[in-house]
Amino acid sequence: MDNYTYSELLKSLQNKCDNIALIIKPEKVKQKLERIEKEQEDPNFWQDVLKARDTNKEKVRLNRLLETYQKTKNALDESVELFEIAQNDNDEVTLSLLYEEAPILEHGVQKVEIEIMLSGEHDASNAIITIQPGAGGTESQDWASILYRMYLRWAERRGFKSEILDYQDGEEAGIKGVAFIIKGENAYGYLKNESGVHRLVRISPFDANAKRHTSFASVQISPELDDDIDIEIDEKDVRYDYYRASGAGGQHVNKTESAVRITHFPTGIVVQCQNDRSQHKNKASALKMLKSKLYELELEKQQSTAKNEEKSEIGWGHQIRSYVLAPYQQVKDARSNIAYSNVEAILDGDIDAILEGVLIAKA
């Protein structure tokens, strides 16, 4: 990097910061936080538990947004000032340090942009994830299990919790399907764009001839809805099936039919849950999954971007990302059009850069 390149970078970041300020209006955010704090001082504030909870969530979000913006703006202003002084003094050491820290400065501005993008109605919610292998038997089932592990590792890296709702072992390897919840701040906001078909190209570990194989798996993301959000489901539109459950890996086979499968006829959505020994609890969890999926479907219709991954054959259509392990190593996202070479790290859950790249591309 040289002086001209760094100078242009600073101008670009300053423009972005100015645009961010126009969007979030920091002074108005401060005023809103002051109003919330006054509301919380009122002894009657906590009588409406749901309203108090929502207000507190908003307070946390606004505080985080303001702090992230202010920290980034201060760092940018300081860099601009230091750059000007270092140029005037021909201070090569300071200039070199500024060049080295340029990516950190860029990431800081990007972080504020991401905070703005995670302000949707349910972005702060937990995420319900369903993974289904495509055609191809063992190959696709193994790929589905690799994706499952990738998301679990991502959750671990962020300090999030996960809970299995349904798990079906593959015939030889991998999984026939899995549904689980990732619980953490903005889990749904970060993962909402993961819905779609994920494609894997690799030398098959199950092929004695070591041929290259292409596998597909479908991922669907929906927000875990709060209990106060009312989604009407007509009983005549659903069928309940009860069956014996087994845990991940085939452990804890139940002697009673505690697992629950719900089929919603109007949409064709099927959900199932077997994580608990109680049929009643599994039914409640399955209903929550169904409501979340129906809500997500309605949201997509309203936005005129309805996706049909679940209704279409999982194959070449509706792909959002390709993971190539052979003959070269690369992960490429179709929305951001960005390619990544750290494939091993990505499959181990290091997907923040991909998720953020898609959020920015879709902004």
Swiss-Prot record:
Q: Where in the cell is it found?
A: Cytoplasm
* Predominant location: cytoplasm
Task: Give the GO molecular function terms.
Answer: translation release factor activity, codon specific
Q: Which residues carry this modification: N5-methylglutamine?
A: 251
Q: Quote a single Gene Ontology cellular component term.
A: cytoplasm
Record note on modification = Methylated by PrmC. Methylation increases the termination efficiency of RF2.
- Its domain of life reads Bacteria
Task: Indicate whether Iron appears among the record's keywords.
Answer: no
| UniProt keyword annotations, A-Z | Cytoplasm, Methylation, Protein biosynthesis
Tell me which Pfam families the record gives.
PCRF, RF-1
Kindly indicate where the leader peptide sits in this chain: none
* InterPro entries xref list: PCRF, Pep_chain_release_fac_I, Pep_chain_release_fac_I_sf, PrfB
Please tell me whether the keyword NAD is annotated for this protein. no
For this protein, the record's Gene3D superfamilies field holds: 3.30.160.20, 3.30.70.1660, Release factor (1.20.58.410)
Concerning PROSITE patterns, the annotation shows:
RF_PROK_I
Q: Which NCBIfam families match?
A: prfB
Family statement: Belongs to the prokaryotic/mitochondrial release factor family.
According to its UniProt entry, the function of this protein is described as: Peptide chain release factor 2 directs the termination of translation in response to the peptide chain termination codons UGA and UAA.
Protein name as catalogued? Peptide chain release factor 2
Q: Which gene encodes it?
A: prfB
